[in-house]
């Protein structure tokens, strides 16, 4: 197997830059810089030389096979974070036989291949690297720490027990089986189905935390939607004008709201129009507003809600509070009056939705659990009917087991890896 190397830290000027090596020649590659090797897991300062020239002073760390991130013999070189120092060491490594620059995500791929991580942990690491908010970080850390693997292993153990009991009735069909195993199998399946359904519900919330919530600002033309968006975003994200119908397309602004990733949507004003371009913008506004997690209905002077019927958590807000007396929740994007109260109301509603978040954070997790549920429900129905053909119920349990195994990458893993590792840098 090749020994791979890459810059593991971000490019650019910094205090420290970290180079990572993994593979059978990792130690020899470090020694090629004319340094004595430190003990494993002991950092040591060494002067790196190449062709008689000092390249840099660096901290060297070695990791033994089976006790590193990748599971292979590995090394880290902590350099001064100058582009020139990093470039000189990378150039030297490229001249060594048996070494090559790592592909994107290849260190993590080797950790997966060597059993250091399961597929769900790899996804958790990808989410951790992409996390923007505290809620995303906490959720990604739960997945990266192995929460999905541990839970799946418990489910798998119970399912294997149920399958083994059912297989026994097939293997000894011509003999007297001393105990009727059907009640125990039914009980195991009922508990598993209940657990998985609860996790499916929680996964929908977890997906929203991972991807971010969408909040649409809707209302009549010139109600102040774009001004409100700018006030919430604390920057000029949308063009504002006294001319009604200025906003034609949906404007998106990503922000951190109370530790949650939120995308605010400024939409076209809702009204009857003969302008085909404006009509298209209104259609898009209604489509995005319906799909949003929450809507802010910004009222104009008429005080009428337009376009859609508000749902339970939606906020109805009186706009342009600086120009007239208002009741209830009201805001002024120009003066900032009421903005903090609106932000707090949004936070309360969105945080309440995260209370039921589970550990399963991706659509593929939810779909795999739903496949397992369907297969187990099919087996359970047959058991309730007396199992005239137990081999059919046993096949359902095998399908359920395969669905659970796909959660952690025991099966069907190759098709997913390209998509997952496409978001990794070469040093990860």
From Swiss-Prot:
Binding locations of GTP: 222-227, 241-247, 266-269
Localisation per UniProt entry: Cytoplasm
One GO MF term attached to the UniProt entry: metal ion binding
Pfam families recorded: MMR_HSR1, MnmE_helical, TrmE_N
Residues where Mg(2+) binds: 226, 247
Sites where the protein binds (6S)-5-formyl-5,6,7,8-tetrahydrofolate: 20, 76, 116, 428
Cellular component GO terms, alphabetical: cytoplasm
Cofactor note: Binds 1 potassium ion per subunit.
Chain sites annotated for binding K(+): 222, 241, 243, 246
Location of the TrmE-type G domain: 212-351
Keyword entries, A-Z: Cytoplasm, GTP-binding, Hydrolase, Magnesium, Metal-binding, Nucleotide-binding, Potassium, tRNA processing
Similarity comment text for this entry: Belongs to the TRAFAC class TrmE-Era-EngA-EngB-Septin-like GTPase superfamily. TrmE GTPase family.
Protein name according to UniProt: tRNA modification GTPase MnmE
